[in-house]
């Protein structure tokens, strides 16, 4: 086992079109940042497993089936009959920017407890990945904190993605507090330039430097949308451009970037802080290309393109 992720598995509803009465027609896509991340890893050669919970409902069954079809180990995916599977509704404004609303009061992902986790999966893995959505409320917050402590105590790498979704937090300060906690646990961080501005009011370069100097992060990866990304460790910092594409749906692109980058890191078999400038560039190019190409298709998990397609685009 290479990577285990803990957190939310949900349905992303995206608007396809509006009918003649002005009502949206929506498509239901399997999603959730940790599983988008795992699906990219799996697509690009890693072995993965998921720790989480869905409801005993139609969408929960669909999500389990989707993970199984993606090759993700579902031994750690639990079903709860007392709560519904979490739903997210994604809408776009005239500029193509996304906004989110959620049916999660509570959702199945939020009621996961530490005593329910299959810790044998963590024992097998090289890396644990998590995000801030599993820190929004109890009991999943404590489950995440205890899982991170368990993984660190057993010598595993920890990867964290802030994945800021303000509608799920009581207020911005609560989000900031928990995200900063997550950053302090992490060896590897994938963060967007918008999230850097939210936390510190600065740009990608200063944000990456802060992650290394103030939080002990060993590899910082800052995504900048169509402008590409910045990767930095103790020895080097590189800027990588993203290929130009005409996006259809950017849902999950950041997660796919993160999973793609970690897949390359694991293949190299080197410590994150030991990666050379050339290695960071290669990781960034592959991840930025995979993420960009995914935006040409709807959904998250379903939008991940084959490795041959990524490599062909990089060569072209």
What are these regions (language model features)?
Residues 133-210, 227-228:
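Conserved beta-alpha-beta core of the PfkB/ribokinase-like small-molecule kinase fold
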């Amino acid at each position: 086992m290479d990577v285990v992720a803990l957190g939310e598995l949900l349905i992303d509803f995206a608007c396809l079109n509006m009918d003649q009465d002005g009502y949206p027609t929506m498509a239901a896509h399997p999603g959730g940042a940790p599983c988008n991340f795992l699906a990219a890893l799996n697509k690009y050669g890693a072995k993965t497993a998921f720790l989480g919970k869905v409801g005993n409902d139609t969408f929960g069954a669909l999500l389990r089936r989707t993970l199984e079809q993606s090759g993700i180990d579902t031994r750690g995916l639990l079903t709860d009959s007392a709560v519904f599977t979490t739903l997210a509704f994604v809408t776009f404004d005239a500029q193509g920017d996304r906004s989110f609303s959620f049916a999660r009061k509570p959702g199945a992902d939020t009621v996961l407890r530490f005593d329910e986790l299959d810790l044998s999966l963590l024992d097998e893995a090289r890396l644990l990945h998590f995000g801030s959505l599993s820190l929004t409320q109890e009991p999943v917050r404590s489950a995440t904190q205890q899982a991170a402590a368990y993984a660190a105590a057993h010598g595993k790498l920890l990867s964290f993605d802030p994945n800021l979704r303000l509608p799920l937090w009581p207020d911005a300060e609560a989000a900031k507090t928990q995200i900063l906690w997550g950053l302090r646990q992490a060896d590897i961080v994938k963060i967007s330039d918008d999230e850097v501005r939210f936390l510190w009011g600065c740009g990608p370069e200063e944000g990456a430097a802060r992650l290394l100097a103030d939080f002990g992060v060993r590899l910082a990866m800052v995504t900048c949308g169509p402008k590409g990304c910045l990767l930095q460790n103790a020895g080097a910092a590189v800027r990588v451009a993203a290929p130009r594409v005409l996006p259809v749906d950017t849902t999950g692109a950041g997660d796919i970037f993160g999973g793609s980058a970690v897949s390359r890191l694991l293949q190299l078999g080197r410590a994150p802080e030991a990666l050379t400038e050339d290695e960071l560039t290669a990781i960034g190019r592959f991840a930025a290309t995979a993420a960009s190409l995914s935006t040409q298709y709807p959904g998250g998990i379903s939008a991940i393109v084959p490795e041959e397609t990524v490599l062909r685009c990089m060569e072209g």
